[in-house]
């Protein structure tokens, strides 16, 4: 099941989220918008299982990466009304 993975421009290019992902959903790509000259990208969101390890690994104050779980996952986890 794929989930929406959103990477914000607050990404500092540290690679923590890429290393934390157990399914290699994320990768770093060149980007001139930060000091590291790279930013996380999510080319394989269809492989995302929604574990949110990437969110946990993100060191920025405002999480630079967010995983938005689909309605079916939210319901099966008992998070829906």
Swiss-Prot record:
GO terms for biological process: photosynthetic electron transport in photosystem I. [4Fe-4S] cluster 1 binds at residues 11, 14, 17, 58. Signal peptide: none annotated. Residues 1-31, 39-68 form the 4Fe-4S ferredoxin-type domain. Keywords: 4Fe-4S, Electron transport, Iron, Iron-sulfur, Membrane, Metal-binding, Oxidoreductase, Photosynthesis, Photosystem I, Repeat, Thylakoid, Transport. GO terms for cellular component: photosystem I; plasma membrane-derived thylakoid membrane. The keyword rRNA-binding does not apply. One of its GO terms (molecular function) is oxidoreductase activity. It is found in: Cellular thylakoid membrane. Binds 2 [4Fe-4S] clusters. Cluster 2 is most probably the spectroscopically characterized electron acceptor FA and cluster 1 is most probably FB. Its EC number is 1.97.1.12. It catalyses: reduced [plastocyanin] + hnu + oxidized [2Fe-2S]-[ferredoxin] = oxidized [plastocyanin] + reduced [2Fe-2S]-[ferredoxin]. It is an enzyme of class 1 (oxidoreductase). Apoprotein for the two 4Fe-4S centers FA and FB of photosystem I (PSI); essential for photochemical activity. FB is the terminal electron acceptor of PSI, donating electrons to ferredoxin. The C-terminus interacts with PsaA/B/D and helps assemble the protein into the PSI complex. Required for binding of PsaD and PsaE to PSI. PSI is a plastocyanin/cytochrome c6-ferredoxin oxidoreductase, converting photonic excitation into a charge separation, which transfers an electron from the donor P700 chlorophyll pair to the spectroscopically characterized acceptors A0, A1, FX, FA and FB in turn. This is Photosystem I iron-sulfur center. It comes from Crocosphaera subtropica (strain ATCC 51142 / BH68).
């Amino acid at each position: 099941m794929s989930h929406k993975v959103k990477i914000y421009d607050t990404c500092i290019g540290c690679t923590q989220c890429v290393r934390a992902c157990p399914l290699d959903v994320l990768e770093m790509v060149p980007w001139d918008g930060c000091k590291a000259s790279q930013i996380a990208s999510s080319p394989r969101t269809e492989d995302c299982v929604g574990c949110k390890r990437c969110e946990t690994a993100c060191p920025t104050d405002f999480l630079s990466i967010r995983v938005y779980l689909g309605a079916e996952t939210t319901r099966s986890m008992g998070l829906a009304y």
